[in-house]
């Protein structure tokens, strides 16, 4: 399927069925939860215009989404309400129904000429799209909009490290870093009788969703949605970016983008984000480059990882050398030793680690340099490396707003050697890289970070 404005490498046909004589073109929204810079949405509008039909957007609100809780649902619903309004301004109905995403897509897809979906990389997301492609009565087309360079275009295998993926990505950047202006819909479709939730039902949807563990929403500390993401981006471009390279490993500062949570829910486009940062030529080149390294190389390395390693959430995903060296040191004495429950309480002997855990619990976020230290100490203080892996992944997915994400799975696995190299052998860690409290004391004002978190926790409790 060709498009006038969307790169052909982003578009993938998922079944061998034809476009049929339906009533509308359906965009099944799941991963890319936005109305701007959304390649799947723009393709659906293009196709609707070509067929002389309306365009409809479907969304399934799943009551038991894998590992989701009240914190995740609240942030997502804030963004979805805004997306609904922006789509309405473009004459496009956003139809939300309770139910599994593929079932909702198939319900509305039964009257569609064509189904367009966005792309997700986790196992359940892949399985959902396969289900829709298999059961839909019409052609299903997937569009990749939550990476800059499509995963298979960047590489045809699981990459060893950032250094092996980086040159492959940079070769393709010019071809995929392109503006995506909105396509006007020729046939407005807001009055189609398709049901779905009204505004009041959407705002109350959280009460019907299974909220898993008791994890409170973060409230006003982080608001969901494209407008909030745009506000964060404006802060970055006008101020924080000028200190990004020097302060990205300084957890006591606030010179970070906070983009991870918005990228996770698809509330901002990585293409748009990259273009904005690259265009901020009033800011130092080293700071722009440091940010783009995280957004383009590290993030898309994580996408590569979960795409080519279906066991991304299993200890088996670790490189052979890491598994071997951790096995060699599995019986090393560990002191102190904490249970997963003791770690979750954030009451260890290490005040720096406790601060990181408490920040994570209070506001669903942790500075990236502290995420690394946090994970390394779980490895050091757990009964076995396998237990440590599961503890880190469980806490990560439970508390972080950007948990349950390809970057989260890659970050946890990095703690245990993924995308890294062997280091000097030492107890417990073997040849896996370690991190020490003395390193934090040497490289940053870690006690200022502890004080900052104490204030954040006090504010959260008010």
Q: Which positions does each model-derived feature cover?
A:
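Glycine/tryptophan-enriched, flexible segments
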Residues: 21, 150-152, 156-317, 444, ...
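Short low-complexity stretches enriched in small and charged residues
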Residues: 9-19, 69-74, 217, 227-230, ...
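Trp/Phe/Arg-rich N-terminal binding region typifying the photolyase-homology
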Residues: 1-180, 184, 358, 377-387, ...
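Active-site-proximal binding-pocket segments
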Residues: 31, 95, 250-450
């Amino acid at each position: 399927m060709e498009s006038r404005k969307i790169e052909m490498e982003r578009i993938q046909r998922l079944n061998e069925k034809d476009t049929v004589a339906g009533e509308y073109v359906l965009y099944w929204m799941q991963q890319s939860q936005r109305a701007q810079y959304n390649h799947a949405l723009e393709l659906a509008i293009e196709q609707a215009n070509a067929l002389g039909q309306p365009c409809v957007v479907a969304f399934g609100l799943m009551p038991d989404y894998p590992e989701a809780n009240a914190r995740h649902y609240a942030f997502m619903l804030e963004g979805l309400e805004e997306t609904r309004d922006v789509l309405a301004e473009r004459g496009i109905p956003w139809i939300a129904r309770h139910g599994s995403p593929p079932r909702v897509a198939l319900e509305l897809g039964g009257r569609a000429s064509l189904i367009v979906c966005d792309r997700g990389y986790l196992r359940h997301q892949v399985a959902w799209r396969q289900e829709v492609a298999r059961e839909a009565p019409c052609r299903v087309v997937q569009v990749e909009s939550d990476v800059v360079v499509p995963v298979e275009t960047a590489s045809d295998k699981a990459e060893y490290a950032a250094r092996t993926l980086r040159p492959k990505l940079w070769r393709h950047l010019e071809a995929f870093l392109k503006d995506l202006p909105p396509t006007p819909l020729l046939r407005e479709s807001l009055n189609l009788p398709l049901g779905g939730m009204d505004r009041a039902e959407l705002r109350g949807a959280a009460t019907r969703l299974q909220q898993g563990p008791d994890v409170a929403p973060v409230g006003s500390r982080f608001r969901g949605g494209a407008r909030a993401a745009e506000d964060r981006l404006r802060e970055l471009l006008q101020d924080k970016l000028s200190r990004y390279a020097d302060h990205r490993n300084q957890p006591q500062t606030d010179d970070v983008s906070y983009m991870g949570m918005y990228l996770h829910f698809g509330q901002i486009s990585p293409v748009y984000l990259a273009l904005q940062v690259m265009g901020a030529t009033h800011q130092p080149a080293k700071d722009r480059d440091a940010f783009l390294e995280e957004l383009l190389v590290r993030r898309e390395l994580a996408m590569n990882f979960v795409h080519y390693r279906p066991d991304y959430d299993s200890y088996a995903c670790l490189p052979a050398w890491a598994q071997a060296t951790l096995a060699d040191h599995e019986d090393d004495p560990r002191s102190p030793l904490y249970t997963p429950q003791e770690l979750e309480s954030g009451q260890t002997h290490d005040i720096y680690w406790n601060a990181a855990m408490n920040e994570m619990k209070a506001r669903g976020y942790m500075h990236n340099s502290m995420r690394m230290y946090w994970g390394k100490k779980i490895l050091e203080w757990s009964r076995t490396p396998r237990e440590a892996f599961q503890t880190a992944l469980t806490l990560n997915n439970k508390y972080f707003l950007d948990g349950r994400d390809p970057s989260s799975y890659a970050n946890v696995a990095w703690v245990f050697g993924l995308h890294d190299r062997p280091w000097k052998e030492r107890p417990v860690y073997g040849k896996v890289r370690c991190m020490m409290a003395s390193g934090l004391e040497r490289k940053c004002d870690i006690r200022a970070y502890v004080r900052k978190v104490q204030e954040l926790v006090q504010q959260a409790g008010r």
